[in-house]
Amino acid sequence: MLFRSETGKSVISLHGIEIDRVNHTTKFNGVELELTPTEFRMLWTMMSQPGRPFSRNELMETSRGEDANSLERTIDVHVRSLRKKLEPESELIETVRGVGYRFIRK
């Protein structure tokens, strides 16, 4: 696990995923991933606190830029898309029944 600049971290690296908030890039095993702005914000949020479950509402709040009027179930669609892009490591984003989602520590 790598965190740079603890107070204002700009890069998080976990399980082969490197997400850079300043350059708005995401790499998985060295290959750049094409994420939507909402997917990027959701992944950043979950990776910034691995193991912590986030409710759909919390994830919606972090994604306000693009989907200000989203329904909670829209988050499920974004998570499904993220999981597909992270295959074969899709289990890194875990469903927490009755709560929402979390990025696992492994």
Where are these regions (language model features)?
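A short, compositionally biased
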Residues: 6-8, 19-25
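Basic, amphipathic DNA-recognition helix from helix-turn-helix-like DNA-binding domains
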Residues: 1-13
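Positively charged, aromatic-enriched patches within helix-turn-helix-type DNA-binding elements
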Residues: 25-77, 81-90, 97-99
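C-terminal edge and immediately downstream basic/flexible tail or linker adjoining helix-turn-helix-like DNA-binding
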Residues: 103-106
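Conserved protein-kinase catalytic-loop position immediately C-terminal to the HRD catalytic Asp
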Residues: 15, 22, 99
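Core catalytic loop region at the nicotinamide-binding pocket of NAD(P)H-dependent oxidoreductases
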Residues: 9, 91-94
